[in-house]
Amino acid sequence: MSALTPHVYWAQRHGEIYLRVEISDAQDLSIGVEENILQFRGQGHGAKGENEYEFSLEFLKPVKPEVKHKSTQRQVNITVRKQEEVWWNRLTKQEKKPLFLAPDFDRWLDESDAEMELREKEEKINKVSFESRVRKDPFLGLKKGFLFMYNLVQFLGYSWIFVNMTVRLFILGQDSFYDTFHTIADVMYFCQMLAIMEVINPAVGLVKTGVMPAFIQVMGRNFILFVIFGSLEDMQNKPVVFFVFYLWSTIEIFRYPFYMLACIDTEWKLLTWLRYTIWMPLYPLGVLAEAVAVIQSIPIFDETKLLSIPLPKATGLSLSFSYILQLYLVVMFLGLFINFRHLFKQRTRRFRTKKRKAN
């Protein structure tokens, strides 16, 4: 009777080979490397039920004889170190891949991603080494306390907005759309004025984020709030105000508590997932709502000549502010594409790192 072979999944880094053998409740394991050939034998429950399984793999290039393995209820994980830290084009010396062997997509990285992972590890080691040599900031506790309180105040403010608007929507229905500004504006003004701190904090080194992304977001929102809604009474009774405010507050009631917990070195996995996921539908919807507000304001600015720039008296004309708004619309959707791509990469990097740690 021919020997039974289990399903084996593999992945690599520059210095290591990872094998995942699909045998549950494995016993009597015999795993070793001789003359660059990995020999595996073990009893357990695999693709052919409860049996003894075995396989051998002749590696493409030399590996170290020491083999690390860990058996769990579901599988056997094997780690083999390469003699040289180089990237392999394939796992085995023979070009034709064994039928039982397949890529482990849970751990799979292409060469460029693996190089990026190496750089991240080196940067982390260098950072830890540097921080161990540098005297700790005596004001670190004060800074964290300030940031915690800032995020707490913003969370409470946006939570009040979100709850107030939700309750009014259930009680009044669509009628709540038309007086949102007069009911919510004071708290929204407060939160958005306070949000200027999100530009100041990175500028003075309180947080390690870019100044420009924060500036674009804060100034973009304040432009909609103070110029489009605040300066035009005709805009304040439009339903679009409800949708803009509701989308803003929905995003922030997840973002600010995430930052609050980060200030005290705490993580709530569900909140982290929401922080890096909920923006995917809400951010484009928010930009769309802001664009609708800008479009609806253009004829009002044309009619009232508000904020128009007067030209020389000889012409008797003025440059309408609506031209600036039309240009702003183009910039807004360009910013949507750039920011969406940036946020998606940030999300991918965040969860890929967490997945590696879990493995």
From Swiss-Prot:
It catalyses: a very-long-chain (3R)-3-hydroxyacyl-CoA = a very-long-chain (2E)-enoyl-CoA + H2O; (3R)-hydroxyhexadecanoyl-CoA = (2E)-hexadecenoyl-CoA + H2O. Residues 3-92 form the CS domain. Residues 1-144, 208-209, 261-277, 339-359 are cytoplasmic. GO terms for molecular function: 3-hydroxyacyl-CoA dehydratase activity; very-long-chain (3R)-3-hydroxyacyl-CoA dehydratase activity. The chain crosses the membrane at residues 145-165, 187-207, 210-230, 240-260, 278-298, 318-338. It comes from the Eukaryota. Pfam families: PTPLA (PF04387). It is a multi-pass membrane protein. Its main location: endoplasmic reticulum. Residues 109-133 form a coiled coil. Its EC number is 4.2.1.134. It is an enzyme of class 4 (lyase). Catalyzes the third of the four reactions of the long-chain fatty acids elongation cycle. This endoplasmic reticulum-bound enzymatic process, allows the addition of two carbons to the chain of long- and very long-chain fatty acids/VLCFAs per cycle. This enzyme catalyzes the dehydration of the 3-hydroxyacyl-CoA intermediate into trans-2,3-enoyl-CoA, within each cycle of fatty acid elongation. Thereby, it participates in the production of VLCFAs of different chain lengths that are involved in multiple biological processes as precursors of membrane lipids and lipid mediators. This is Very-long-chain (3R)-3-hydroxyacyl-CoA dehydratase. It comes from Danio rerio (Zebrafish).
